[in-house]
């Protein structure tokens, strides 16, 4: 999908890429942005570290599920559909220039998807919390994020149209993966 996006971006002389969806869609937009700006190198070569990207088209994100935090992170995960191998690439070139984060765009999600998003936010937060480095401030922020996600997740799963809980989850998801907590 990302390779097709690169072809379309090159064909249309795109100067910007927008990912509207969740983490996978936004990560795909990031890959397209890197691929189009570094053509003719195949994007997978960046994710396998065979090559280093030096440029990227600007990326914007429109978030429709609170989960991965890709809307504010410098990382992107891709899966090579031919091999099934999944890899991540962290570079400031990946960080979106802007993110539209309107909780109303998440209110049609089924409760199961809301719960999956809550779990994803918690995992990103715990990844950073349980690292060997001690930092009282970032640990306290991570603990606050976990408390918030647990409390608001319970509300959101029962009532995905609760603006406040969906807003809190959206904010927590972004903070869990933007580098603030390690």
Regions found by a protein language model. Give the residues of each.
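General beta-strand structural signal in soluble alpha/beta enzymes
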Residues: 18, 28, 61-62, 101, ...
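Active-site segments that bind and position negatively charged phosphate/pyrophosphate groups
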Residues: 128-182
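Short glycine-rich or small-residue beta-strand-to-loop segments that form or flank ligand, phosphate
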Residues: 17-20, 60, 176-177
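A glycine/threonine-rich phosphate-anchoring loop and its flanking beta-alpha core
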Residues: 37-136
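N-terminal small/polar loop signature for handling phosphorylated ligands or for N-terminal nucleophile
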Residues: 1-40, 155-166
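General structural feature for long, well-ordered alpha-helical segments within catalytic domains
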Residues: 1-5, 13, 28, 118-121, ...
């Amino acid at each position: 999908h990302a390779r097709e996006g690169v072809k379309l971006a090159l064909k249309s002389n795109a100067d910007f890429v927008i990912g509207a969806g969740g983490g996978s869609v936004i990560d795909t937009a990031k890959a397209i942005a890197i691929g189009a700006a570094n053509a003719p190198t195949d994007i997978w070569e960046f994710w396998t570290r065979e090559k280093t990207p030096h440029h990227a088209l600007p990326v914007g994100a429109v978030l429709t599920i609170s989960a991965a935090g890709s809307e504010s992170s410098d990382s992107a995960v891709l899966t090579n559909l031919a091999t099934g191998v999944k890899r991540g690439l962290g570079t400031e070139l990946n960080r979106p220039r802007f993110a539209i984060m309107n909780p109303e765009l998440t209110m049609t999600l089924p409760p199961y998807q809301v719960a999956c998003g809550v779990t994803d936010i918690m995992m990103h937060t715990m990844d950073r919390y349980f690292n060997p480095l001690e930092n009282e401030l970032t640990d306290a922020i991570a603990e606050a994020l976990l408390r918030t996600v647990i409390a608001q997740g319970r509300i959101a799963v029962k009532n995905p149209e609760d603006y406040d809980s969906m807003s809190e989850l959206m904010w927590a998801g972004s903070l869990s993966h933007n580098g603030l907590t390690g």
